A protein has these predicted regions:
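Bilobed "Venus flytrap"/periplasmic-binding protein-like clamshell domains
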Residues: 54-77, 112, 135-203, 210-212, ...
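N-terminal hydrophobic or amphipathic helices and topogenic motifs
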Residues: 14-94
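Ligand-binding "clamshell"
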Residues: 117-129, 223-237
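Short helix-initiation/N-cap motifs at beta->coil->alpha
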Residues: 86-97, 186-203, 242-244
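Acidic, polar ligand-binding/catalytic clefts
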Residues: 97-155
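C-terminal segment of classical bacterial N-terminal signal peptides
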Residues: 4-13
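Hydrophobic residues within well-ordered alpha-helices
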Residues: 99-100, 156, 205-206, 248
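Periplasmic-binding protein-like
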Residues: 57-58, 132-141, 228-266, 270
Length: 272
């Protein structure tokens, strides 16, 4: 009873201190109305950790990313003057929870989980990847087997269709928002099966375990480059306009100086 009363009192006090938080969790405040969590007004609450923890969205096997990110992590360490540890997260929800609990300081969140990271974990997104010609983003693509009888989206009715995970944009949220206007309603016209990842969805289509799957174009492009499937075995049924890609963000409660150094590291590094 005492703990519950204390928790309620704390929440009430927090609510009284914060006049505006929009869709943010009760842990955070948004007095300036920019839709992301404000830094703590009490400077003693600001963090300046000796070791920074960085994670990247687990759209594919997390193990492949550590080597890919090592050169940037070295650069980040040099610019900030701190040790940097790569944290291989296993799911979108685990990544959001790690940031919310203070175990993560810098992260790349894929499109779907970004609003959850902002609202539930207090992330401040500051950048996405782009190309030198100003292009950015990826597409939701619906794949089926090359010899499939699925020719248009309405043909998905009654089929085995794999979504990736509930929080994924191209793997679940965008299909639920866009497919009804294309003639098919997920969970109504076909039963949704979650494969757990874009690469598992794609490999499942290739193997015939699924009749079709909505996936992120950037993931299947990388899979093809690595020889994980033969593009001749599959066919695109439909693709969307581009969505913003992975957002990079920092924890809201890092010191302003540290946030600036982290951003400097991202913007001064040659990712090409």
């Amino acid at each position: 009873g005492l703990m519950a009363a204390f928790a309620m009192t704390g929440t009430t006090a927090l609510a009284e201190e914060c006049a505006e938080r929009g869709a943010l969790d009760a842990m955070f405040c948004d007095a300036n109305g920019d839709l992301v969590a404000d830094a703590p007004t009490d400077e003693s609450m600001l963090k300046d950790p000796s070791t920074l923890v960085f994670a990247y969205t687990p759209v594919e096997d997390p193990a492949i990313y550590e080597d890919i990110w090592t050169p940037f992590i070295d650069h980040l360490s040099e610019v900030t003057g701190k040790k940097v540890q790569f944290f291989a997260v296993q799911s979108n929800s685990a990544e959001v929870e790690a940031m919310r609990s203070g175990r993560l300081h810098i992260a790349g969140f894929s499109t779907g989980p970004t609003p959850f990271a902002v609202n539930l974990a207090g992330v401040e997104p500051f950048a996405i990847m782009g190309s030198e010609d100003g292009q950015f983003g990826y597409k939701l693509q619906v794949y089926t087997q090359a010899d499939s009888d699925i020719k248009e989206m309405a043909d998905l009715a009654g089929k085995r269709v794999a979504h990736t995970s509930p929080t994924s944009n191209s793997g679940n949220q965008a299909p639920r928002a866009l497919f009804p206007d294309l003639g098919v309603v997920p969970d109504q016209d076909y039963e949704v099966t979650y494969s757990a990842s874009h690469d598992q969805s794609m490999l499942g289509v290739v193997a015939g375990d699924y009749d079709a799957a909505p996936v992120a174009s950037e993931v299947v492009d990388r899979m093809a480059e690595r020889g994980l499937y033969d593009p001749a075995e599959v066919r695109i049924v439909w693709e969307s306009d581009p969505f913003p890609t992975t957002s990079y963000g920092v924890a809201h409660d890092l010191t302003p100086e540290l946030k600036d150094k982290i951003k400097e590291a991202f913007f001064s590094y040659d990712f090409t």
